[in-house]
Amino acid sequence: MQIKLKDVKFTFNLKSSWEFQALHGIDFEVNQGEYVGIIGQTGSGKTTLIEHLNALLMPTTGTVEWIYKDEVFDKATKTKKEVVVTDVIGLKKVRKFKKVKQIRKRIGVVFQFAEYQLFKATVLEDIIFGPVSYGMDPKEAEEKAKKYIKLVGLPEEYLKRSPFDLSGGQKRRVALAGILAMEPDVLVVDEPTAGLDPWGVKEILDILTHLHESGKTIINVTHDLDHVLERAKRVIVLKNGKIIKDGQPYETLNDIAFLEENNLQPPKLLNFVNKLRAKGVNVPKVTSEAELVSWINDYMETKNKKEVSNE
């Protein structure tokens, strides 16, 4: 699926004394298989932006366009065939977007406090709720639940448990499994690691990486720039409802002056690397702690060998 936003503007409480414009002329597109990090200060418009991606919000002005493959019934051959579909909102004012189901089953959104989305008596019922609502056979949905509960790192036995007996991190995994069970083309996650312990953070990020490697589009809204540096292939920076940067993670996040000018804390990894470079250590481009540790080990080994040979 390809998503295109063209000159999207959005105003809350339009024509009232509480009117507030949250997005100003947003232009960007996301292609199938990308891993995009979206960053910016609180109030920069990140959540408002992603709510346009699956038609939870409709632009005040501008357009959102979705291009995707779908199956239609061919009356001539009496068989289903695959076609490319283009849906657009914003070309004319409508109260209700008719294609919302087709869009939302292809673009799954896991919000920051996803655990509050759980409301059924069992984990199984919660996971299959979305797929069944969008037309999946209940038996097939149960098989998807068994598949994705394991993918998010929970045993199948958890399907029988009440979601309200789970920890916050476990609830978030169940909410993620519920979205994945719909098998969307695009997965949008809003602060997916907030409040998790380091091991939980790594597991969630590994799941997102695995999904990306399997061909899904990942859009990760986060305050943790180290996660964007290590995992994302593209980063979008928002400020006051505008995109002020759209580029490669390393080049963008290593621009310390740009980050500080926009009140963003540089990644801890690059802070440390830049301190080493300031002391004359020629550290190469690294994007993860593992890469840095590996390079330091090689560097120290080479340095020690030179010192021994000079004795």
UniProtKB/Swiss-Prot annotation:
Determine if Transmembrane helix is one of this entry's keywords. Answer: no
Q: Which InterPro entries does the record match to this protein?
A: AAA+_ATPase (IPR003593), ABC_transporter-like_ATP-bd (IPR003439), ABC_transporter-like_CS (IPR017871), ABC_transpr_CbiO/EcfA_su (IPR015856), ECF_ABC_transporter_ATP-bd (IPR050095), EcfA2 (IPR030946), P-loop_NTPase (IPR027417)
Can you list the GO cellular component terms from the UniProt entry?
Answer: ATP-binding cassette (ABC) transporter complex
Its chief place of residence is membrane
- What are the recorded GO MF terms, alphabetically? ATP binding; ATP hydrolysis activity; ATPase-coupled transmembrane transporter activity
Q: Which residues bind ATP?
A: G40, Q41, T42, G43, S44, G45, K46, T47
Where in the cell is the protein located? Cell membrane
For this protein, the record's SUPFAM superfamilies field holds: P-loop containing nucleoside triphosphate hydrolases
Q: Name one Pfam family in it.
A: ABC_tran
Q: How does it sit in the membrane?
A: Peripheral membrane protein
**Annotated EC:** 7.-.-.-
All copies of the ABC transporter domain together span 3-265
By sequence similarity, the record places it as follows: Belongs to the ABC transporter superfamily. Energy-coupling factor EcfA family.
General function of this protein = ATP-binding (A) component of a common energy-coupling factor (ECF) ABC-transporter complex. Unlike classic ABC transporters this ECF transporter provides the energy necessary to transport a number of different substrates.
Q: What is this protein called?
A: Energy-coupling factor transporter ATP-binding protein EcfA2
